[in-house]
Regions:
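Extended, well-ordered protein cores
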Residues: 1-53, 63, 67-265
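Conserved active-site alpha-helix within GNAT-family acetyltransferase domains
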Residues: 56
């Protein structure tokens, strides 16, 4: 599958549960023309058929190369980012929950569901395949959330793109992230304020911000219906270094705060 088709399929799946993204994209298209996607991100569980290292060959099949690796100690995550030789192709960021670092109760709860994942050859459609297990109960979701918001989100939503990202560098009306976020707020969308609305600085070469996740009603086990966070839209401004080369990587401290965009509390 070529990257163009991959991202087209992803976008259609994404806006099904993130309608705010389509509205925000149209908002900027009206004044800035084509909105360029900087990167997408995914979440998964370690120690399962869907673990990060099993997904990597699929990304490589589209011509991507490994860019870097990351560790998020407090959230018990590890991650890898991937970059394509064609600079017009968005970057990809995949993280996984290191379940072995969770409490025994949380590990058992997750295993109850991830044991339902069918062992089979994976293809790129896995990235919009959602849950490979039954929906948990509301009590299980809520209990897991107390220990890992990331894990609770993943248990309910499954493997779907977590966010797309507007490349502020390619906007024509502004290159200031605060202006972009203000415009998003003026349009009625909430933004992630954890660590401040803007994560990172010009000096660190990467400034990021995001909306708070959309919310949709899901039916949990036992016919219990509850509204939960789905996915969000990110905004990234990349700056050049002293040699004039625009930074293309990711910064752990920024990403750590961006993860909070799906918090239910």
């Amino acid at each position: 599958m070529k990257p163009e088709l991959f991202f087209s399929e992803l976008w259609q799946d994404y806006i099904e549960i993130t309608p705010q993204a389509e509205k925000i994209k149209q908002l900027f298209e009206a004044t800035d023309g084509t909105v360029i996607n900087d990167h997408v991100a995914f979440r998964t569980f370690a120690h399962t058929p869907l673990q990060l290292d099993n997904l990597v060959p699929l990304i490589f099949s589209m011509g991507y190369e490994l860019q870097d690796e990351y560790t998020f100690t407090a959230k018990k995550l590890r991650a890898k980012s991937f970059i394509h030789p064609d600079p017009s192709v968005p970057k990809i960021f995949i993280s996984e929950l290191r379940t072995e670092l969770l409490s025994e109760d949380a590990q058992a709860m997750i295993k109850k569901y991830t044991d339902q994942i069918e062992e089979k050859d994976l293809d790129l459609s896995v990235f919009w395949s959602a849950r490979h297990w039954e929906m948990p109960s509301w009590d299980e979701y809520h209990a897991l959330m107390e220990e890992t918001e990331y894990g609770a989100w993943l248990l309910a939503i499954g493997v779907r793109v977590n966010h797309f990202t507007v490349s502020i560098n390619h906007l024509t009306t502004t290159n200031e992230i605060r202006d972009v976020l203000q415009r998003v707020k003026d349009a009625g969308f909430g933004v992630n304020t954890v660590g401040g609305e803007v994560k990172g600085t010009k000096e660190s070469l990467l400034e990021q911000g995001s909306t708070m996740a959309d919310r949709q009603e899901y039916e949990f086990a036992g016919d219990q219906k509850h509204e939960i966070p789905t996915c969000f839209y990110e905004f990234a401004m990349r700056h050049p270094n002293a040699e004039g080369v625009v930074y293309q990587g990711f910064i752990e401290a920024n990403a750590d705060k961006i993860f909070e965009s799906t918090n239910a509390k």
